[in-house]
Curated annotation (Swiss-Prot):
Function: Involved in the binding of tRNA to the ribosomes.
Quaternary structure and partners: Part of the 30S ribosomal subunit.
Organism of this sequence: Aliivibrio fischeri (strain ATCC 700601 / ES114)
PROSITE patterns named among the record's database cross-references: RIBOSOMAL_S10
Protein name: Small ribosomal subunit protein uS10
Gene name in the database record: rpsJ
InterPro entries assigned: Ribosomal_uS10 (IPR001848), Ribosomal_uS10_CS (IPR018268), Ribosomal_uS10_dom (IPR027486), Ribosomal_uS10_dom_sf (IPR036838)
Length: 103
């Protein structure tokens, strides 16, 4: 797999889970002899929702909720065959969304 690059994008609501997963990926890639760039923190997406607390009147009484989506980017520049096999066998947390692209 010469002159290839593996780009891994991670998304999660919990920043502790995403940091733990990135550490596992980086440690696995370095252990198998690949060159790693990252983890690069991407902008956090904040979704805010405003809900009326009263079912009928009192429009002034509202609750506000927020969901934060944390994102990280990892580039593995020169992956070996061992690296690809180790990443395929890696078991990450259930709350982390992983997108892998070859380039």
């Amino acid at each position: 797999m010469q002159n290839q690059r593996i780009r891994i994008r991670l998304k999660a609501f919990d920043y502790k889970l995403i940091d733990q997963s990135t550490a596992e990926i980086v440690e696995t890639a370095k252990r198998t002899g690949a060159q790693v760039r990252g983890p690069i923190p991407l902008p956090t997406r904040k979704e805010r929702f405003t809900v009326l607390t009263s079912p009928h009147v009192n429009k002034d009484a509202r609750d506000q909720y927020e969901i934060r989506t944390h994102k990280r980017l990892i580039d593995i520049v020169e992956p070996t065959d061992k690296t690809v096999d180790a990443l395929m066998r890696l078991d990450l947390a259930a709350g982390v969304d992983v997108q892998i692209s070859l380039g």
